[in-house]
A protein has these predicted regions:
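Loop-to-helix junctions at membrane interfaces in multi-pass transport proteins
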Residues: 39, 55-56
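Alpha-helical tetratricopeptide repeat
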Residues: 42-49, 87
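Hydrophobic/aromatic side-chain positions at a characteristic register within alpha-helices
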Residues: 50-53, 94
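Long, low-complexity, highly charged intrinsically disordered regions
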Residues: 21-44
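Exposed, low-structure sequence patches enriched in small/polar residues
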Residues: 63-66
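Residue-level detector of the short coil/turn that links helix A to helix B
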Residues: 56-57, 97
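Catalytic glycan-binding domains that act on GlcNAc-containing polysaccharides
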Residues: 4-15, 24, 36-37, 71-309
Length: 309
């Protein structure tokens, strides 16, 4: 029954839950004077975080937020045993650019008290940093900007300098060799620039969408596990009775043999649905209708992969 999970969202949409009244309301952030039951160490770190944010020292605030997110009290993250405290911390973490901590605290707060759901609190789980970069990448690649944001949220939690164990880089976690396929002049260091990384990510995702006839779930599986594996999974399922009448994302996701990819595809579809709800980019009657909601890029975009940004 949790609408912030893929299947919980599916159930809520199926039951025709209407979030419009709550999401139309933009509440101010939860009172930042909240103290709750904090340890002395948490209290000191929280004071430092607030002071750094007030002075506009975002880089230092981000480092303090990273430390604060790791400090535990009574077995829980700071504020996570109290709905308003969790949302207050989510807002501070978001201001500091620690979106991963913001996600988890906002999720905890809204799980404790669903009545606190509104445009402001939901946006702490589904923020849109670097939006101008994503919009520029969408214009160039032809892929919906909200889909690009949804991928970056899952890939890097919007951390521009993220580096994975496999050496995938930046917001959209691209391997340098993959980025070279679509932006031949890009360098490794370029991929830490949001403007370049989102362009490369958009162009590569467009390439996958084109290969899989605009099927978003298939393209996402390919983005995570590779196009060869995704194509094999598609082939394996082609004779499955439930797939003969049309593509069913639930069947496809449940049949993905890799647990990481199953979760990855479902989470991004959930992200995409919530971003559409929050930006009023259209009502959603089913997650299935998101499967082909992308516009094929005009011909002038077909040469974009050959050009440097």
């Amino acid at each position: 029954d949790n609408p912030f999970t893929y299947y919980g969202l599916q159930a809520a949409i199926y039951l025709k839950h209407d979030w419009a009244p709550q999401l139309a309301y933009s509440a101010p952030p939860v009172e930042t004077k909240w103290q709750g039951s904090l340890t002395s160490r948490q209290t000191l770190s929280l004071w430092r975080l607030r002071a750094l944010l007030e002075e506009g020292l975002i880089d230092y605030a981000r480092e303090e937020a990273k430390f604060l997110a790791l400090v535990k009290g009574n077995g829980a993250g700071i504020g996570q045993d109290d709905a308003k405290g969790a949302l207050m911390m989510a807002n501070l973490f978001s201001e500091a650019g620690n979106y991963m901590a913001a996600f988890s605290h906002a999720y905890a707060g809204l799980s404790l008290d669903p009545s606190l759901l509104n445009q402001t609190s939901a946006s702490l789980i589904f923020p849109q940093p670097f939006l101008q970069d994503f919009q520029a990448a969408a214009e160039r690649s032809g892929v919906n900007a909200l889909l690009l944001v949804s991928v970056a949220k899952q890939e890097s939690a919007f951390l521009p300098n993220a580096v994975s164990r496999a050496d995938a880089l930046g917001l959209m976690q691209l391997l340098p060799v993959t980025a070279k396929e679509v932006l031949p002049d890009s360098s490794r260091s370029d991929l830490f620039l949001p403007s370049v990384n989102t362009q490369a990510g958009g162009l590569y995702l467009y390439k996958l969408l084109d290969r899989f006839q605009g099927n978003i779930a298939m393209a996402l599986a390919a983005y995570n596990a590779g196009p060869t594996r995704a194509a094999q999974w598609q082939k394996d399922l082609s004779e499955f009775p439930l797939m003969k009448e049309g593509f069913d994302p639930d069947v496809f996701i449940d049949c993905i043999p890799y647990a990481e990819t199953r979760k990855y595809v479902g989470n991004i579809l959930r992200n995409y649905a919530w971003y559409k709800l929050l930006t009023k980019d259209g009502t959603i009657s089913s997650v299935q209708e998101l499967m082909f909601q992308w516009q094929k890029a005009p011909k002038k975009q077909e040469t974009a992969a050959k050009e440097a940004p």
